[in-house]
Every structure is written in structure tokens, then in C-alpha cells.
Design a protein with these regions (language model features):
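Sequence/structural signature of outer-membrane beta-barrel proteins
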Residues: 13-19, 43-54, 82-104, 122, ...
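Repeated loop/turn-to-beta-strand initiation elements of outer-membrane beta-barrel proteins
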Residues: 5-6, 34-38, 74-79, 119-126, ...
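Outer-membrane beta-barrel "beta-signal"
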Residues: 220-222, 246-260
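Short beta-strand segments enriched in hydrophobic/aromatic residues
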Residues: 1, 12-14, 72, 81-83, ...
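Hydrophobic, lipid-facing positions within transmembrane beta-strands of outer-membrane proteins
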Residues: 27-29, 34, 62-66, 75, ...
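Detector for outer-membrane/organellar transmembrane beta-barrel domains
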Residues: 106-215
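C-terminal structured domain segments
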Residues: 211-240
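Outer membrane beta-barrel
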Residues: 1-88, 112-123
């Protein structure tokens, strides 16, 4: 159109654990016109590093939003107003970690802004969001650089206090190196350090407990449209084992993914 490309999208996602636990939900549903996008969509916080080790967002990274993005090719900038209507999730570090403070009910509002650029073999973006109900915000930077046989990724995140966008820790640094071993095989070792993981009743970060994690993600293209992914991660949380999420643990998954 004279206002730019017009696009509508509806995505459905189904899950079946057993005969009595199954269902299909709307994954995304939005309209785009030029740089304007409105509807139910993933936020920019969903776009973290490519591997499966990092924890760079909190709570639900999807909801109703009104977004505008200006894209000049090697540079882009965007602003988004988001409805923060989902409940508060458990910590992504460990479900045993008790989050202090509290969130109010649904229909809260958040504001996000992002800028990004590409400089030769390097791409980078800086994302900032503010939770108007919690009166706290978070900033996250991600940089990718093509180095040798793979791509190096580095990210840092900081939060002023507990908020909908990021409340896993007061700050964190994550790095990965995605090695393109063959046309079909990519191996991505990664590590992350999270500083000050506890939240006080006033929603401020408190204490001196930290956590770190390391792992590897393996992606293999079996054939056109069929991929396999295997991820294994090790994590260590400060404190007395078994108390408030402290101790070490191993996690992982195996996934077959069909694309059309």
C-alpha cells in the first residue's frame, strides 16, 4: 500500500501431554502496516542469544502491544507500548528461589525502546524497558561478531529492581560461541554469571548470593525442514544446598523440530 507493506499473521501452538491434558492456543496474532505492528506478539525480550544456556528475560515475553520500528537497513530503532497482563512466573534460575515483593494484577503497562545496527561482521542492539506499575526497569545489550568458524555472542543486562521484563538478578553477563562445524552441525558452548539474585519485600535486589551456569547446545539439520536440538546445562547457585534454590544442578532437553 502507499503506507507500506500490509501483513496479517495468526499462529497457533498445540501441546499434548496426555489424553486429559492437551490444547491449542493462539501463539501470536497481529497486523503490520509498514513499521507499525499491533496485536498479540512476542516482545523484544524474547530475542536473546542463539543458544539454550542464557537467562536474559523474565516472566512472559509475549502479550498485547503497539509497536513502531524504523528500519534503515544497517540501522533500526523502535518503540513499543505493552500490556503486562500475565501473572508473575517463578525464577528462571530455579523454581525453588523465593521472589520477594509482589506484583499487582493484570492490565499493567510497560514501555520499551530498542536501537540496533550492523557494522560489517558485527551486529548489536540495546534494549530498555520500564514497568510503570513496579516503577522499575531493565536494560539489555547484545552483540554478535563473526569470528573464525563461528559467531561470538555477548550480552549484559541490568535491572533497577524487580520488574516484569527482567528480575532474575540485579545484573548478568552471558557469552557464547556458535561454531559452524559443518553445513548441518552447529555447536554452541555458552556461560553466564548472574549477580545478586535475591529480591527483598520492597522489590529491591538484596544480599550477596550469585549464580553461574555453563552449557552447550547442539543443532543438527537432519534434512530439509527437519532439525534436531540437544541442550545440556550445569548451574551452581550460592548458599546452603537445597535451601532457596541453592546448590548445583544439571538440566537439558532433546527436541525434534519440523518447519514448513
Amino acid at each position: 500500500t502507499e503506507l507500506g507493506a500490509l501483513r496479517g499473521y495468526i499462529g497457533l501452538r498445540g501441546q499434548a501431554n496426555n489424553d486429559s491434558s492437551r490444547g491449542v492456543n493462539v501463539d501470536q496474532a497481529f497486523i503490520e502496516l509498514g513499521g507499525l505492528k499491533v496485536g498479540y506478539m512476542y516482545t523484544w525480550w524474547d530475542d536473546d542469544l542463539s543458544g539454550e544456556t542464557d537467562i536474559l528475560s523474565s516472566n512472559t515475553t509475549r502479550g498485547n502491544a503497539l509497536r513502531y520500528t524504523y528500519d534503515a537497513g544497517s540501522f533500526y530503532a523502535g518503540i513499543s507500548v505493552e500490556e503486562l497482563d500475565a501473572g508473575r512466573d517463578v525464577s528462571n534460575i530455579s523454581a525453588e528461589i523465593t521472589k520477594g515483593g509482589s506484583f499487582e494484577g493484570p492490565n499493567n503497562v510497560g514501555v520499551s525502546g530498542i536501537i540496533g545496527a550492523k557494522f560489517g561482521a558485527v551486529t548489536a542492539n540495546l534494549l530498555g524497558s520500564y514497568d510503570t506499575d513496579q516503577e522499575n526497569g531493565a536494560i539489555r545489550a547484545i552483540v554478535y561478531a563473526d569470528i573464525g568458524p563461528g559467531t561470538f555472542g555477548l550480552s549484559g543486562v541490568w535491572a533497577s529492581g524487580a520488574n516484569y521484563y527482567y528480575e532474575e538478578s540485579e545484573w548478568a553477563v552471558a557469552a557464547e560461541y556458535a561454531i559452524k562445524a559443518t553445513d548441518k552441525l552447529t555447536i554452541t558452548p555458552a556461560a553466564q554469571y548472574l549477580g545478586t539474585i535475591d529480591i527483598a519485600p520492597d522489590n529491591d535486589f538484596t544480599g550477596d548470593r550469585d549464580a553461574w551456569r555453563a552449557g552447550v547446545t547442539v543443532d543438527y539439520k537432519i534434512t530439509q525442514g527437519l532439525d534436531a536440538k540437544v541442550a545440556v546445562n550445569y548451574q551452581d547457585v550460592d548458599g546452603t544446598d537445597g535451601v532457596n534454590g541453592a546448590g548445583d544442578s544439571w538440566t537439558g532437553f532433546v527436541r525434534l523440530q519440523r518447519t514448513f
